[in-house]
Amino acid sequence: MSDILFVSIGAILGANIRFQIHHKLGNLNLDKGFLILIINTFASFGLGLFLSLVEQFRAFTYSYQLILFFSIGFFGSLSTFSSFVYDLFDLCLQLELFRALKLFIISVSIGIIAFAFGLFLGTQ
């Protein structure tokens, strides 16, 4: 099977799960930036956990395709970087520079922590 197909199937699943999470949490009337933070944190954690477990798949014939499926396809599509950037840009246009900076710092920091925590859990 083509590598592109593995990435594509993972992306379809990731995008649909992102849509479902956004839809379900959107009913709670949370701030849009906070929703994006939750989804991106979940994706960062999942990617970290997956990458820490990759070594177990090395002996599997399709290990490279699994990496493509999950890391680029699924988790790449699940995260919402473009929405994150749009929110930052929108805050800057509204001259809410402190809120934009706060959103940037919190989102990147929590994303790195979630990724590292996923890596840590996968090695335990």
Swiss-Prot record:
Signal peptide: none
One of the record's GO cellular component terms: plasma membrane
Any one GO molecular-function label of the UniProt entry: fluoride channel activity
Alphabetical keyword list: Cell inner membrane, Cell membrane, Ion channel, Ion transport, Membrane, Metal-binding, Sodium, Transmembrane, Transmembrane helix, Transport
UniProt subcellular location: Cell inner membrane
Positions bound to Na(+): G76, S79
Pfam families: CRCB (PF02537)
Example of a GO biological process term: cellular detoxification of fluoride
Main location: membrane
Family per record: Belongs to the fluoride channel Fluc/FEX (TC 1.A.43) family.
The name this protein goes by in its record: Fluoride-specific ion channel FluC 2
Gene designation per UniProt: fluC2
